Design a protein with these regions (language model features):
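Auxiliary Fe-S-binding modules of radical SAM enzymes
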Residues: 2-16, 22, 199-289
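Conserved Radical SAM active-site core
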Residues: 2-147, 156-158, 170, 182
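Hydrophobic faces of well-ordered beta-strands that scaffold small-molecule active sites
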Residues: 35, 91, 124-126, 148-150, ...
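A short acidic, glycine-rich active-site loop
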Residues: 65-73, 167, 235-247
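Active-site beta-loop-alpha junctions enriched in small/polar residues
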Residues: 96-98, 129-131, 151-155, 192-194, ...
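A structural motif corresponding to the C-terminal end of an alpha-helix
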Residues: 116-122, 175-187, 247-266
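Non-cysteine beta-strand/loop elements that form the S-adenosyl-L-methionine
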Residues: 138-155, 213-226
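Conserved strand-turn element in the central/C-terminal portion of the radical SAM core barrel
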Residues: 166, 176-199
Length: 289
């Protein structure tokens, strides 16, 4: 892997990247994506269960995860030069960072990449927990095949603050989902991993009432040794302190099935959007695992 040259900017680190679109690997490739796109390295949301802190792209100590980011300052220029090769391809935005970190409000790297991609209409999946995503509704509405996944791992903001200390509040994410839905953009809700819940039955009811195009749930997991795929040990230890958490996951899945909900468990739910899914509003259906 080629390491981009790091330079210092007045307000923090930026990097000169050699490419902005990388061939998909791992579960993202298995899901059917050809490319990933990461405008930033690192992440300031600081999720304690994040697999990305263990990946080779993170060259900082694990203890510093959530305290830093690096912006690829030439990301938009690179996207403009290479977007044509992604015509119609499946693109995952983003795999090792969040495309809507707070700094994106000022830097506009993600928006610039979207503007470069738009004429070539790749099948785009946006993965975020950042409410800033609604800023780009005008671009999403011009896409033929798009889905925006928003992470909603719990119903309890105190739990969110424990596991995702710097991530946006849950209600702001629900507000973003509502705005996306109002704009006609297909959405996915990712309960991945499922964190401890305050009111499990009410949480299931809210998921069902919203009825996202795709619903994904996943428990804390271990991969059996594949580098970087495990849920962070610190997060598993936190979850273990909440009595009955494993049983709660099974109960949530059982209730979803009892209510006839179509949902996916784990990586099975991360698949490219279908062409014209936005306009047809046809749900992609797969039997529960």
């Amino acid at each position: 892997m080629t390491t981009p040259r790091t330079v210092e900017a007045g307000s923090g680190p930026v990097q000169e990247a050699r490419s902005i679109f990388s061939p998909a690997t791992g579960f993202i490739r298995r899901a059917g994506f050809a490319w990933t796109c990461n405008p930033y390295l690192g992440c300031t949301f600081g999720c304690r269960y994040c697999y990305a802190m263990y990946l080779p792209q993170n060259r900082r100590p694990i203890s510093e995860w959530g305290r830093w980011f690096a912006a690829k300052r030439n990301a938009v220029e690179l996207a403009q030069h290479t977007a044509a090769k992604l015509r119609g391809a499946a693109v995952y935005l983003s795999s090792v960072t969040d495309p809507y970190l707070p700094i994106e409000r000022r830097l506009h790297l993600t928006r610039g990449i979207l503007e470069a991609l738009l004429p070539f209409q790749p099948r785009l999946l946006v993965q975020t927990r950042g409410p800033l995503v609604v800023r780009d509704l005008d671009l999403f509405q011009q896409w033929d095949a798009i889905r925006v996944n928003v992470s909603i791992p719990t119903d309890d903001d105190a739990i969110r603050q424990t596991f995702e200390p710097k991530a946006p509040p849950l209600e702001k994410r629900w507000d973003a989902l509502a705005a996306l839905r109002q704009a006609g953009i297909p959405v996915g809700i990712c309960v991945t991993p499922l964190l401890p819940l305050a009111r499990p039955q009410a949480f299931v009811e809210r998921l069902l009432n919203f009825a996202p195009e795709v619903l994904v749930v996943q428990e804390f997991h271990e991969s059996g040794g594949r580098f970087g795929a495990d849920t962070a040990p610190a997060a598993r230890e936190l979850a273990a302190r909440h009595e009955g958490h494993a049983a709660a996951y099974a109960a949530v899945c059982q209730e979803l099935r009892r209510r006839g909900a179509v949902f996916f468990e784990g990586e099975a739910g991360f698949f490219p959007p279908a062409v014209d899914e936005k306009r047809s509003r046809v749900k992609t259906i797969c039997p529960p695992r």
